[in-house]
Amino acid sequence: MHQLSTSICLCFVISSPYVYLVSIACVLWTSIPFTSGMMDHSAMHHSGMDMDHGHGDMDMGGQCNMNMLFTWSTKDLCIVFSQWHITGPFSLLMSLIVIVLLTAGYEGVRQATRKYEAAQAQRLNVFSTTTATIARLKPSLTNGVQGNEFADESATTNVPSSQTPNESSPLVAGRDNRRAVEQRGKIILAALYAVQVFYSFFIMLLFMTYNGFVMLAVAVGAFAGYLVFGDNQSAAKTVACH
C-alpha cells in the first residue's frame, strides 16, 4: 500500500502545474504510513525491553543482602564473600560453627606468638650468659698459659695466631651466632604479627555484617579461645583491630 501511494503521488507531481505544493502534499502523505510503522516498531521495541526488564527483575532474587544496621534477619545473608551465602537454617548453623572456630583460632595464634617470644628470649639469654662466662674466664686462661713454667717457649711462639688465647674465636663466634638467631627470630615474629593482623581484620569483617547471629558467634569464639589458649594471661586486653 505504501509503495502504491508513492507511485500515484509521483505520477501526479509530474502531471501537475503546481509542482511545489503537490510535492509537499505527497511527501506528507507518503510519510504517514512510514512514521506509523516506526512508531509501531518503537512501541514493540520498548515493549520488548520492558519484558526483558521484567524477566531481569524476576532473576534478581537470591543475591547478597548487605546490611548497614543491626539485624537478626538471615535472608540472602553473605558473610565476607559472595560465595559464603546463607541459603537456609543448615548453612546458617554450619557458618556459625565455622565462625566460632575461626575466632577461637585467633587466640591460638596469639598463644603461639607468645610462646615463640618466650623461647626466643630464652635463647638470647643463653647466648648472653655464655658470652659473659667466656669473657670472665679469658683473662685467667691467658695468665695460666703465660705463667706455666713448663711451657715450651718455642712451641708458644709457633702457635698460629688464630689459636692463641688472646685472639681465640669463642666471643666472635658467640656474637655471630647471636646475631643470626636474632635476625631469624625477628623474621618469624614479623610473620606471626602479619598473620595476627590479617586474622584480626578478617574477624572485624565478620562483625561488620551487622548480623546478630554472626556477632554472637564471634563472641562465643573469643570466649572458647581464651578458655583453651589463654594460659592465665590477662583478660584486660582492649579489643582493637590488631
UniProtKB/Swiss-Prot annotation:
Subcellular location(s) per record: Membrane
Entry keyword annotation includes Membrane: yes
InterPro entries: Cop_transporter (IPR007274)
Keywords, comma-separated and alphabetical: Copper, Copper transport, Ion transport, Membrane, Transmembrane, Transmembrane helix, Transport
Membrane topology: Multi-pass membrane protein
Cellular component GO terms held in the UniProt record: membrane
UniProt feature, compositional bias: Polar residues: 154-169
Keyword hit for Oxidoreductase: no
Superkingdom as given in the UniProt entry: Eukaryota
GO molecular function, one term: copper ion transmembrane transporter activity
UniProt region (Disordered), positions on chain: 153-175
Transmembrane segments: 8-28, 86-106, 187-207, 210-230
Family: Belongs to the copper transporter (Ctr) (TC 1.A.56) family. SLC31A subfamily.
Cited function: Transporter that is probably involved in the transport of copper, even if it does not act as a major copper transporter.
Record-given protein name: Copper transport protein B
Lineage per the UniProt record: Eukaryota, Fungi, Dikarya, Ascomycota, Pezizomycotina
Gene: ctrB
